[in-house]
Regions:
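Early-domain small/polar-rich strand-loop-helix modules and first-structured segments
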Residues: 1-95, 152, 160-162, 169, ...
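Active-site neighborhood for divalent-cation/phosphate handling
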Residues: 107-175, 289
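Conserved phosphate-binding catalytic cores of ATP/NTP-utilizing and phosphoryl-transfer enzymes
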Residues: 1-14, 156-188, 291-309, 390
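Small-residue (GG/TT-enriched) beta-loop-alpha framework at ligand/catalytic clefts
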Residues: 142, 149-242
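Acidic, glycine/GT-rich loop-and beta-edge segments that sit at the periphery of enzyme/chaperone cores
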Residues: 298-385, 395
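Conserved phosphate-binding loops in N-terminal lobes of ATP-dependent enzymes
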Residues: 42-133, 217-245, 250
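Glycine-rich phosphate-binding loops at beta-strand->alpha-helix junctions
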Residues: 132-144, 247-276, 288
Length: 434
């Protein structure tokens, strides 16, 4: 439920969920919409085991399904049929055969998500959930389609369900940390199968402050299969420690890093000793694995009711609109700027529909203002064959919609002007570079 505040904003009265859906595990965090810090649901009551194995298990011969740790246990001890890689199967879209029966992979994924949400029952009712943010490693068009089907299958009462990638969750999480922790660059080292680094940089000289996130992969820093013999195992750990320390020196030698987050099960194996000392030199270092689900909560909180700090920043990721799109307009007799699309919006969500009065001429001019540098650029749409009418006697409906990260489709329709000048029925379509 939304409640109107005195300042006209809307705030979430209920609960916000952040759901991190991975190929191997899922995590669930939740918070109220009043700015409270998110909490993460444990897969085992009374522990900090946040990872929920993203698997299902079917009991042989009957239509009974188990999920998560219970599914793994039932498959191991009772001979159930284990279905793994649910996210990958849903992306492929091919039927999953279990005991000769075909199952829709998106429906199986929705079943897993629905069952996993039952972990919330001892804390809250799902009827209290107003908004849900899914976060995944990479948000492709196919992934959006899969998540949309999953969301529909959940049959939640939530008014808002959105999707974002891990980079956006990292950004949202960072902006909700103490300012001292994000005074300079913020880095994630993520170590599951192989090592990945994310580096968040903020240009504090721009308004709004532009945030960029650099990604680096280190395929040579792979998870180790530890030897049984203790001496050989210790040698493996020392070699990995040295390799990671070398990677840290190479990647962090430029710029200043305030904070480092170590994510992933690979950092839980007790090998990072000298490299950890190196990381801690003049930097704050945190270890955990629930950053993305918490970041998803924060992102949804900001989407519903943006904070003052959020409004000061704009994240320009790969899928984000890099420029503001607007036009000059006359308001109450004074020249002004009319904002159409805002930089920092996901390009596939960026659209605007509005009416204007054409003052004169037969063109509509747009202003493109890049936040990554460079001057303001003009884009013009020519209205061929528009009826000749007196000054300011033509009303136009304009629809602008992004069709790619740097391209917008513009549709303009002649609405005429009251009874004096009926609509001509003419419409114009153009593509502009943004």
């Amino acid at each position: 439920m939304f409640q109107s505040q005195k300042d006209g904003k809307k705030s979430a009265k209920g609960v916000i969920l952040g759901y991190d859906l991975g190929h191997q595990f899922a995590q669930i965090s939740y918070c109220t919409g009043d700015g409270a810090e998110p909490e993460t649901v444990s897969a085992v009551t009374g522990t900090e085991q946040y990872n929920i194995p993203a698997v299902l298990c079917k009991r042989a011969g009957v239509g009974q399904w188990y999920y998560g740790k219970e599914a793994v246990k039932f498959a191991r001890e009772e001979g159930g049929i284990l279905v793994e890689d649910l996210l990958m199967l849903a992306q492929r879209g091919e039927d999953v055969m279990v005991e000769g029966e075909a199952f829709d992979p998106a429906a199986l994924l929705a079943l897993f998500v629905k069952r996993s949400l039952s972990l919330l029952n001892i804390r809250l009712s799902l009827y209290q959930v107003d908004a849900l943010m899914f976060t995944v490693e990479e948000l492709t068009p196919r992934m959006v389609d899969v998540l949309s089907r999953v969301a529909a299958g959940l049959q939640l009462k939530a008014k808002t369900i959105c999707f974002q990638n891990h980079l956006e969750s990292f950004y949202a999480y960072t902006l909700h940390q103490d300012e001292e922790l994000r005074k300079n660059d913020v880095v994630i080292f993520e170590y599951n199968t192989s090592l990945r680094m994310l580096r968040l940089e903020c240009n504090q000289r721009t308004s709004p402050m532009v945030v960029l996130i650099e990604q680096m992969e280190f395929p040579d820093v792979l998870r180790r299969v530890w030897a049984q013999e203790e001496q050989e195992r210790e040698k493996q750990k020392q070699e990995l420690d040295q390799l990671f320390a070398h990677t840290v020196r190479e990647t962090l030698e430029e710029g200043i890093v305030s904070t480092i987050f170590l994510l992933g099960d690979g950092f839980k194996e007790g090998w990072a000793k000298e490299s950890l000392k190196l990381l801690c030199r003049g930097r704050r270092v945190f270890q955990g694995n629930n950053l993305y689900s918490k970041g998803a909560c924060y992102a949804m909180m900001e989407r519903l009711n943006p904070s003052a700090e959020w409004k000061k920043h704009v994240y320009l990721g790969a899928d984000k609109l890099k420029s503001n799109v607007g036009m000059k307009a006359l308001r109450r007799g004074e020249d002004s700027y009319y904002a159409i699309l805002d930089a920092g919006t996901n390009w596939y969500e960026a659209a605007s529909d509005f009416d204007v009065i054409l003052e004169e001429g037969n063109t509509v001019d747009f202003l493109i203002t890049p936040l990554t540098g460079g001057g303001v650029m003009g884009r013009q749409v020519h209205l061929a064959g528009i009826p000749d009418r007196p000054r300011a006697a033509t009303r136009l409906n304009i629809h602008v919609e992004m069709t790619a990260v740097n391209q917008a489709s513009v549709t303009i329709e002649d609405l005429g002007f009251g009874e004096l000048f009926p609509p001509s029925g003419k419409a114009w379509t153009a593509t502009i570079q943004v």
